[in-house]
Amino acid sequence: MTKKLDPPTAPSSDEDDVETSEDDSSSSEEDEPIKSLPATTAAAPAKSTAVSAATPAKSTSVSAAAPSKSTAVSAAADSDSGSESETDSDSESTDPPKSGSGKTIASKKKDDPSSSTATLALPAVKSGAKRAASEAATTSTKRVKKDEESVKKPALFQRLWSDDDEISMLQGMIDYHADTGKSPSADTNAFYEFQKKSISFEVSKSQFSDKVRSLRKKYRAKEGKDEPRFVKAHDKKAFELSKFIWGPKGIALDSNAKSNGVSKKSASKTKEKLDSVKQDLAFVGVSSTNGDDWFEKSSLARMIAGSGIDEYYVRQKWSSFTLETKKIVEEKFQLMQAKELEAMLDKSVRLTDLTSYFVDASKN
């Protein structure tokens, strides 16, 4: 016999609504993007309450189903992020319902965007720190290299002679004259050996001579001025020392300085001495009462005898001359000797001038 089967009982409307609500909520969870704004979460319970008031039966069933869904979603969120708690997931269980649905929808809690942003930004921060550290190291290395180069490279146009060196040079010229009684220009090599240890650096002979000429030229530039002005006290002190050296009564020799220490000033003194000698000779010749003494003591007899005449004969004839003749001869020879001395002096002065030209040429 064929047994009739009872038709399946139709589900109640409440069950249909619950299933429909579950399907809608599941589809909304798949379709909607995850939202976790606090304002939306806070507004969700109020809207859910309003929907529940409109449909009590549905609200009850949905409320019963929503926690389970929310709990599952919270568990999934905890497993993914590892940073959210069950309390936070339960409190944010629902999202605002779709417009026109009239049903509360349980939404899946969205991951915290701040934690995701922090996780993504962390490598960038580390990269920036490494870059800043590398740039700082590079800058420090460049600065060290630059400092080393600045130390290695000597400064251009570096001044060798300091103010103290100039004063020491001028004072050394005065001290050299006081110790030796000679002018520093008389023997430049001796003065160089005397003074070079007082200079702050190892000075060469050419540098030494150039500095002496430079100081003398600097003094000459201010010498002709009535009231020379000085910017620094050093310039004034150097001028006073230079005046003592190259001034009108200075100890050093000017461009006419001679290698043997004789200057025109000393030559004029020599000339004065010669004039006095000439006067003495003239006085002796005029006042001489016995011309034989002068002739006998002179070399004239030997000079005449040297030309081939007997010396005894010359002396004998000289004694036969009258006194007036002897005086005339004596005066003439004395004048001749004075002229010879003047010629010798003039020759000495000219040789001295010529020597000074050679000295100046050797310094250049």
From Swiss-Prot:
It comes from the Eukaryota. GO terms for cellular component: nucleolus. Keywords: Transcription, Transcription regulation. Residues 39-80 have a biased composition (Low complexity). Residues 1-149 are annotated as: Disordered. InterPro entries: GEBP, GeBP-like_C, GeBP-like_DBD. One of its GO terms (biological process) is regulation of DNA-templated transcription. Residues 13-32, 81-93 have a biased composition (Acidic residues). One of its GO terms (molecular function) is transcription cis-regulatory region binding. PANTHER family: BNAANNG10740D PROTEIN-RELATED, DNA-BINDING STOREKEEPER PROTEIN TRANSCRIPTIONAL REGULATOR-LIKE PROTEIN-RELATED. Belongs to the GeBP family. This is Probable transcription factor At4g00390.
